[in-house]
Amino acid sequence: MSQKTMELYIHIPFCVKKCQYCDFLSFAADEATQAAYVEALLREIAYYGPHCSDYLVSTVYIGGGTPSWLTEEWMAQIMSAVRRSFRLASDAEISIECNPGTVTDHKFAVYRNAGINRISIGLQSAVDEELKILGRIHTFDQFLKTYELARKNGFDNVNVDIMSLSLIHISEPTRRVVIS
């Protein structure tokens, strides 16, 4: 009989600010709220891990929100709890969503040390005017720097999210309706 596998999704609902187009559960939160959430998340990971002991985790995806908005210490604690509580495949893909402006060289180094091996960067558009309309907190230049930092820290698997249709390419009346 083959090994049963599972995927693990961890939601971090915090963002610097909510983008206008985002339908995901996410919001800005102070440090105390984030700390309480991380503590609750660590308890849940410890609780559910033993219930999944028959499974090998092939993928861990840390999404949001903006998981990279959390401190690197909290992310290291989360990854440590995952490793203690779940059986990870030796070749498990472990991804984290990052937004330019919320990561540093040090954060990427901590992620790499914690076993994260895939970065997903939310670029959305390479046009600064469009990024502003979308409510993004970064510029295209900041994205390029973030991408280079990820590569410099040994991340060979870097995903870039780009929207296929954006508000700058539609008529002004339609844009107003979509934004409202």
Give, region by region, the residue ranges found by the protein language model:
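A structural motif corresponding to the C-terminal end of an alpha-helix
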Residues: 85, 114, 149-158
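Non-cysteine beta-strand/loop elements that form the S-adenosyl-L-methionine
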Residues: 11, 108-126
